[in-house]
Every structure is written in structure tokens, then in C-alpha cells.
Amino acid sequence: MIDEKRIAIKCVTGSHATGLNDDKSDIDRKIVFYPTIDELFSGRHANKQTIMPEEDTEYVDIRSFMKSLQDTTINGLEILFGHDINVVDENISPILTNKNNIAKCNLPKLFLSTSGMAYNQYKSFTSLKRPNNAKSVLFFDRHSQDTKSLMTIVRLCKTLELFAESEFTDFQSSFCFKDDEIGKRYMLNVKNNVGNLTFEENVEFAKIYMARIDVLKDEYMKHSIDLDTNGFVSEVIHNATLINMIKNK
């Protein structure tokens, strides 16, 4: 258990953050915490995860969080754009205030990491192997295919598409479908295979989305890294970590 004094941010992530939750969805939480002095100087990151029947909690070392923001990965951004965000330490609040700049500070890496996640989900889906993930098993057993992974492919591809369409100004609406009833219904229909599509039909469906993000690659890759924003992230997190360490030594 992480000492409350070492916690920087708490938030709800996963389907509740993207607006794609239903009455069967459990709650995913992420807690960003500061390292102890020993962890800091040993270089050891103490990330860990606890899984309960209705709630999963991931503890994220703030140094890992910093790297995920500088690389502009979905895993980092979902904390900034999550649901029910609680900034426990105000020294970290400038990060949240500047989240829109952070979301576009490394667009090439955002594209590569997100499209890579989509491709891994595609490989998992097309393998037709029963997934290890307990959340996906329910859908595999019901439909004889991992339709939860299929929805994730569509969601990741749509996020890249919508963010580019907004000219990289509105990650919130690109990432979260809470206020988009049509988009939300579409995603949940994919997950629940409302159209009763065969596996082969869903593979072709996934290929369409994978092809659509291939077209976006140049649009993302032509942007350079925003070193000023990267430096800002580093400065805020390093200072907040130092202050926390002094207060709680």
C-alpha cells in the first residue's frame, strides 16, 4: 500500500474514462505516486497493480508517468484526461493545467505507440486464441471471438483519426466518447457484436480501421517534438518530487 503522503494524482481510467462503460464494466483506477528516497537513488520504479473483482488499481511511479507524458502515450494521457481526477498534491497541478499542450508535444511518438497498440490488439484478435485477460474472456466465450479487443482496435484508430481532424487541439473529444451518443453506441455494438458478424467479417472490419490510420501516418510524423513542453513536464515533476521528498523524509 502506498502512503497517502506520497500520492500525487488519483483518477478513474479505462471504460469509465472513455465513456464506453456499461452496467457490467468494472472500475479501473490509476494512482500516481512519488518514490521514496531509496527508490529514487536506486533507480527502481515501484509500479504495481492490484486486481479486485469489481475494481483494478494501477500504481504508477511518477517517473514512469513523466516518461509517458514526454512520449505522449495513451497510457499517460488517459491520466490527464481521465474521469474523476483528484489532484492530491497541488505541486503537480500545472501538468493538468497544460494537458492540451502535453497531448500534442510528441505527435510522432503518439502515432507510433497508439498504432502499435492497435496492431497488437489486431494480432490478438486474429489469433482466435482464448485471451488471458479476464475481461476479454467473457466476450470470447459469448461470441467465439475477442470482440472486446476488436472494440479497442476501433477506439484507438478513432482516437488518432479524431485528434488529427481537430488539428491536434481537442484530445478530450478524440479520446472520450461520453458526450458522443452515436459514437458510444457504435463502439458498444462492436464489443457486443450486435450485428452477429462472423469472425472473418470482423477481421475485414478491423482491417478497414487499420488501413485508415496508415493514411494518417505522415500527418503525425511531420511534426517535431515540442522540447519546451517536454522540459516543462520534467521541471514540474522533478520539483514536485523534491518537495514531497523533503516534506516526508
Show the residue positions of the predicted features.
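Catalytic metal-binding acidic patch
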Residues: 18-52, 153
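Non-catalytic regulatory/linker segments of enzymes
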Residues: 5-8, 22-24, 232-240, 247
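Helical scaffold of the NTase/Pol beta-like nucleotidyltransferase catalytic core
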Residues: 1-16
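Extracellular structured ligand-interaction cores
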Residues: 28, 66, 148-150
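A basic- and aromatic-enriched beta-loop-alpha substructure that forms the phosphate/nucleotide-
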Residues: 41-131
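Conserved nucleotidyltransferase catalytic core and NTase-mimicking acidic/glycine-rich helix/loop elements
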Residues: 93-238, 247
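Phosphate/oxyanion-binding loops and surfaces in catalytic or ligand/nucleic-acid-binding neighborhoods
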Residues: 36, 72, 163
